[in-house]
């Protein structure tokens, strides 16, 4: 007899994940557990994505981790979660599935109005230093007057991302996500903001986060017309060589599996692939495809 319960204890979740040889590398807000005779058989960790909800004017949920001892149990757990999301009028659910978890991917693909919206490759490396010639542009922290130019550069710079692949999100909505994401980072979310300027013009930017012993490349963009001029290399090298970054154990970056240019840059700079994921958006209120 299966039962689904909310608010599973942190200790029970950690014990279950250890039994599955899984690690939790992201924070979460809520938990849902599938139990059989009082034994935990599966967990679903999720959060209200308040920031996305505000920008898109939609109710958005992010599933941070989904795991069970069998595909059947995982399906039972996710369908219980999905039913509640239908009742509380959630607009869309974002689910990240490890690429090797074929069972989980199959369960998500079977849901009504489920859309594959991309894939992510996570790469990592220890902090290091680089031999490099001085760039033809200036690098440094942004000035207050740079904000709008940086946010405008975010427009159409991330078209390979999941938001642009969702048929229920307009191009303008996807662009607004990244412009407000960039602005939020400039307003204090990011631990590091770096801007590249040429003759006073913003031609690139990078934003990095700090989480425990990990420095995370969050956003990076180069102005059209300046690609192939090593701007991204110098931005990333500048981040990695920051004194605060050097205190971290690893530097991580993520990009879409089909973003070959970005992957080649990261590999040339010493990053190695660590994990890959499939991304899905599910719209509980939409009609089935």
From Swiss-Prot:
Keyword Transferase assigned: yes
Pfam family, one: Acetyltransf_1
Molecular function per GO: acyltransferase activity, transferring groups other than amino-acyl groups
Pathway named in the protein's UniProt entry: Spore coat biogenesis; spore coat polysaccharide biosynthesis
InterPro entries on file: Acyl_CoA_acyltransferase, GNAT_dom, MshD_Acetyltransferase
Keyword tags: Acyltransferase, Transferase
Region forming the signal peptide: none
Xref: SUPFAM superfamilies: Acyl-CoA N-acyltransferases (Nat)
Highest taxon in the source lineage: Bacteria
Record-linked PANTHER family: L-AMINO ACID N-ACETYLTRANSFERASE, SPORE COAT POLYSACCHARIDE BIOSYNTHESIS PROTEIN SPSD
Protein name: Spore coat polysaccharide biosynthesis protein SpsD
Species of provenance: Bacillus subtilis (strain 168)
């Amino acid at each position: 007899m299966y039962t689904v319960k909310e608010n599973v204890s942190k200790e029970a979740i950690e014990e279950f994940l250890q039994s599955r040889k899984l690690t939790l590398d992201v924070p979460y807000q809520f938990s849902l557990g599938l139990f059989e005779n009082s034994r935990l058989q599966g967990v679903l960790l999720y959060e209200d994505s308040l920031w996305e909800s505000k920008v898109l004017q939609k109710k958005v949920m992010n599933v941070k981790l989904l795991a069970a001892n069998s595909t059947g149990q995982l399906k039972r757990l996710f369908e219980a979660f999905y039913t509640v999301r239908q009742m509380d009028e959630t607009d869309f659910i974002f689910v990240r599935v490890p690429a090797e978890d074929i069972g989980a991917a199959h369960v998500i693909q079977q849901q009504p109005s489920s859309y594959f919206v991309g894939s992510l490759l996570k790469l990592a490396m220890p902090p290091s230093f680089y031999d490099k010639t001085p760039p033809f542009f200036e690098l440094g922290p942004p000035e207050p007057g740079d904000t709008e130019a940086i946010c405008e550069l975010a427009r159409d710079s991330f078209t390979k991302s999941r938001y642009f692949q969702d048929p229920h999100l307009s191009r303008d909505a996807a662009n607004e996500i990244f412009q407000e994401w960039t602005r939020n980072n400039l307003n204090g979310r990011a631990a590091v903001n770096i801007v590249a300027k040429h003759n006073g013009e913003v031609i690139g930017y990078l934003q990095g986060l700090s989480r425990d012993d990990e420095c995370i490349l969050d956003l990076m963009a180069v102005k059209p017309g300046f690609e192939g001029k090593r701007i991204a290399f110098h931005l990333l090298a500048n981040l990695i060589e920051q004194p605060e970054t050097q205190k971290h154990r690893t530097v991580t970056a993520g990009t879409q599996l089909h973003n070959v240019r970005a992957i080649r840059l990261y590999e040339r700079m010493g990053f190695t692939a660590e994990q890959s994921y499939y991304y899905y958006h599910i719209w509980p209120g939409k009609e089935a495809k």
